[in-house]
Amino acid sequence: MGFNSDATGIHSRSVFKFWNPSNLFRLTAANNSNRFYPASVSDSVVKTARSFKKDKHGMPTYPDRVRHRVVRTTAYSHEENEVGVPWRKNALGTYLKYGAVRSAAAYWSKYPVGTKFKIKGLPYTYIVDDYGSALVGTNTIDIYHPNLSSMRLWGNRHIEIAVIQWGDWDRTLNILAGRTQYTHTRKMYYAAKARVKSGKVARN
């Protein structure tokens, strides 16, 4: 169960109060110096983002058909020692990943478990295998880092991603159905269930 960096208030590097494309370009261009930092968001992706409803952070809520998207990201690490979370374990009970494939936490009614995506400018594949209470109701993705220093370097970034594979909605519902005693997982469960019932979900 990932810990969302917004809740800590200790490492927000963002210059954004609300969605502002010009700020995004300055931030990503200044930090695009090695394989740790993402590339700038494409003009076309910024333009597309303007047409969609925004979440509480001012970020677009996309339909599943739009796979290239700009998202707000935060960072977390098992070294934060979130209460109740096993050492370096994700919401599936397996180890968090930080290699060619890397772990990410998200609101599972937006990004079901197993969703895979690429971050523009980085060579890694990210997989949604975690969640966090601060992510509920948002389009934010929380990127896992193995230590506090890299977590803080990432901070709060607006980046471009490409969804390469949607996760498994049935698996998502099965996992969350057994965790409805917790407020955040209960909200995720019913939101995901409503989306599946609507038929407006991608199944690759």
Please give the residue ranges for each predicted region.
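Solvent-exposed, well-ordered loop and adjacent helix/strand elements within mature globular domains
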Residues: 1-204
